Structures are given as C-alpha cells and as structure tokens.
C-alpha cells in the first residue's frame, strides 16, 4: 500500500467529484444517506446504550457510503445492502470494524467527559441526549468553553478515523494500524484536506445565506425554516459522497508488490 502526497488543489477536485458523482446517482446517494441517518437515529433511541451504539456504528456506516460512491463511479446503481458492506466482508474484517467502532465511541465519549469537567455536563448532555437550546444557555461562558474544547479535541479524533474504516475494509489493515496510517495520510496531505474542508464550509455557509436571502425577498420567514433542513441534508449527502475520493487519491493498492498492511510514501498528482 502506497501513500500518495497530493497537491493542495486536489482538495477542490474532491469537492467537484462529490457533486459529479452525486448527480450521476442522485436517487441512490440521497436514499442511502437518509438510510444512514435513520440507522444512527434509531440506534440512539435504545435506552442507556443508544448514543454509544450510534457512535460505534458510525465508522461502518460511513464505509457503506464510501462503498456506494465507489459503485457509482463505476456506473453502477448502489443497492441499499451496500450500506452494510463492512459487515459482509468476512469475520476477521467484521471484528476489526467493530473494534474500530468501539475505539471511536470510546474516544468521543472521553471528549464528552472532558467537556463535562468544564461546564458540569451541560454541553455533553445537550449533544448526546438532546434538549432545548436557549439563549441563556448558549451565553454561558462554561458552555462556550466546553463547546470549543470539544471541537478542538474532536479534530485529532476525526483525523485518526478519517481513512481508518476504508483501510480496514479495502486493505485489511488492523484497527490500530489504520488509525496511524489515517493520521499520517492526513498529515502528509494537510494542504489538500484544508482546502477541502474550507470549500465545504464555504458551500454550507453560502447555501444557508442564499436560502435566508430568498426567504427575505419573499417576505416569508417560514420559508427559511422549512427549506434550511432539507437543503442542509442535501449538502450533507453530497459531502459524504465526496469522502471516498479523499481516500482513493491518498492510497494506492500495491498488494501484488508488498504486504498490504505496510505503507510507503510517494508523490502523486491526482486531478
């Protein structure tokens, strides 16, 4: 397995490929994303363990969407069963994916525990259990500190797991190694990933502003309230479609030349 170092402009290419692939199979990719959201939402309804279970399922579910994108790039219509690809790859890989999910859940819950030390658990409770967000709560200094601490700590966690599910599934890498390789790939391609992330933040912000402006022009504030949610889900579906390309261009399969669980570094120029 070879790690490709890509130029910064590749970040924009990943975004474009996300839109292009989504438009090739809009019905399939939208449907799978909604199934993805429904699966995690249903998991959270289970008493006591719901939130942890949803977190543990997230790496496998994300892998399912990546597999769907891969199918779409081949001109195929991804079927609903592709969402559980991680659990159809043999006992060894299923076990590895479950371990990866458990590590992700543990890491996230540790972050929530740290945030609870800052504000007494207000932010963590709101995030994991839900509840009403009031202006008074948001203005609390401890709540804001807990929120920013969570965001700061989640960044390294997300980088550790960014490529990990795909490495486990497609390259047979062990969970611990997949975390290391994922972090290394994100570090080596930090410029492309930064451009990629900034582009998506820009797309989200501009889209929300456009919807708000349209509502203002129409003189109908209810339009914004009704449109923001489905439009936000649409953008999220395209975002998840694009994630596969960040993995595809970062790693090259060289299993015929060397062990697939070893890694070498090479300069690359995917466009």
Give each language-model segment a name.
Residues 1-271:
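Hydrophobic alpha-helical membrane segments
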């Amino acid at each position: 397995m070879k790690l490709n170092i890509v130029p910064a402009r590749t970040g924009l290419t990943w975004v474009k490929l996300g839109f292009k692939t989504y438009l090739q199979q809009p019905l399939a990719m939208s449907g799978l994303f909604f199934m993805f959201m429904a699966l995690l939402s249903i998991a959270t309804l289970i008493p006591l363990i719901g939130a942890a279970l949803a977190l543990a399922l997230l790496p496998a579910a994300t892998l399912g969407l990546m597999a769907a994108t891969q199918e779409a790039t081949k001109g195929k219509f991804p079927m609903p069963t592709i969402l559980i690809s991680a659990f159809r790859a043999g006992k060894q890989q299923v076990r590895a994916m479950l371990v990866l999910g458990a590590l992700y859940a543990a890491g996230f819950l540790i972050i929530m525990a740290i945030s609870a030390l800052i504000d007494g658990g207000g932010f963590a409770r709101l995030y994991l259990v839900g509840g009403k967000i009031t202006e008074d709560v948001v203005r609390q200094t401890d709540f804001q500190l807990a929120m920013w601490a969570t965001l700061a700590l989640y960044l390294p966690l997300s980088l550790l797991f960014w490529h990990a599910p795909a490495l486990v599934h497609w390259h047979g890498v062990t969970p611990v190694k997949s975390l290391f390789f994922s972090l290394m790939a994100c570090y080596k391609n930090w410029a492309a990933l930064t451009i990629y992330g900034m582009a998506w933040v820009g797309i989200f912000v501009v889209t929300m502003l456009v919807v708000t402006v349209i509502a203002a022009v129409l003189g109908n504030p209810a339009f914004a309230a009704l449109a923001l949610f489905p439009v936000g889900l649409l953008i999220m579906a395209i975002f998840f479609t694009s994630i596969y390309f960040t993995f595809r261009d970062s790693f090259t399969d060289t299993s015929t030349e060397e062990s697939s669980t070893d890694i070498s570094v090479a300069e690359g120029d995917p466009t």
